[in-house]
Structures are given as structure tokens and as C-alpha cells.
Amino acid sequence: MSISTNFFRLPNMPITSAVLTQLAEQHYHAYLSAEQVKALCGQFQLSQIDFALACLPIAACYSKAPISEFYVGAIAIGESGNFYFGANQEFESVSIGQTVHAEQSALMHAWQMGEKRITDVVVNYTPCGHCRQFMNELNSAPTLRIHLPHSQNNALHSYLPDAFGPRNLNITDCLFDGPTQTTQPVNLTEAAIEAARSSYAPYSHLQSAVALQAGERIITGRYAENAAFNPSMLPLQNALNFYRLQGETASISRVVLAENQSKLSKKESTFALVKAELGLEAEYIAF
């Protein structure tokens, strides 16, 4: 089911209509700039957080949950003031462990867009332990605030006391501290390699990324590692999440995975999901 079809299920409210109008003008890219947020907060006389809470049903429309049928929306707020929407993404044909959680979705959306720091995460259900651990990898983890419909302004570490994270492993440059892509690659292979070089992998040092060809657009997803390993974001999931949140409708025709030489490889899991989800044979580049 298309994302725009999901919007028809939303209640007919002025604030919902105003946000959907903005999204429609940008081809349903699930993002609001700081300027758009400021204008809409002023129009409806809402604080930034109350406005984000009102946007959660819209964010949840980007969910793809054929297994659980449990639709979670999240919004990551950058220090820029930009809103990055996210939603859970499930894949029927592979391990359930490859699911993208809504908080991960929103945070990776922000990371892919070049945001440097997240101040707040707004979500319509209490974060699970997996997401709490994932958020603890952020450079803003010590000050990150979590907001729920029933409870606002909660410190991340109130959900994750005595937390284990990158600082326990003497990692000082955390997720969102690293480099971002700075050029526009001319082809899919170059795009995958350049994205891989911007991976966050301080534990394995694996540089890994996927590039998707969707019509005339190239969409990439980078590997983002976690101190606890299991909550790490795989590059294909990151790319597919970004594809969906961009509002893309063009079919994916090619997939390239690029990796450096490392103790790890995401080749097997990536190829399996590409075959199961897209019906394609992925291409592999070692650099």
C-alpha cells in the first residue's frame, strides 16, 4: 500500500491538513525544515514538542508493518530545528531481527540528511530496549530528551540507567560526529563507495554501504554500528528506509553493496534481503 493512501485514514483536522500540504509539495519527503516548523507552530500556537506530537500519526503512515501490523511513528529533532520523520519497517521474507524500529528510522533519516546532533526524539510508544541502546550511541545521548504522548521531557538515561555505550569502550567520536557525503557521485558504484567511507564503525572498522538505483535517482544507506553490536543499522535497511521516507515511488532496478576489507561483511544478509524483498541480484564491490 502506498504512503499517500495511508494518509486518507488520518482524521480530518486542520493541523493534519496543513502538514500534509507541505509534504505533498515536496513529493511526500517525510521532513520539515526548521522554517516550516516555526511557521506551523506559529499558525497553530503550539510549542515545538506539542507540534511534533501532533505530527506522529502522519509519521506512522510511513510504517511498513506486514508482520506486526503495529504502526509506530517517530520524529527526530535536530539541533538545526529540522524535523526528521521515521517509522518502523518490517521485512516478511527474512529474519525478524532485520526490522528497522521507528526511532532508528527517524535517526538514520537525520544522519543521511547530514544533521550533526539530535536534541529530542518524539515517538508514539515507549521506546523498547533495542531503541534505547541504539540512541545511547548518539553524540547527544547524555542530553537527549524523549517525548511520548503521555510523558514529555524525559532524559534518555532515565530509560537506560547505568548504560553501556561507546564511552565504555573509549570511543570519543560517536554517531553523528563523523563525516558526511560531500560530493554527488556520477554512478551507482561511486555512490556506494563514497557512502561506505562515511560509515560509523568504530568497533569493527567495516566501511559498508548500499546504493539503490530508483528511476534516475541514486539513494544510499551507510552502516551504523552500535557498542552492543545487535542494534547496529545495516546499510541496506538504511537505504530502504531512506528510500521510503523520501516518498520515492520509482521502482528499484539495481543495488550495489560496497565494502572495505574487514573482519565483517554484510554481503550475505544484504544479498538475501535484496533477493527476497526486491527480486534482484545485488552487485558487490570490494575496495
Which residues are covered by each model-predicted region?
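Zinc-dependent deaminase catalytic domain
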Residues: 1-130, 134-287
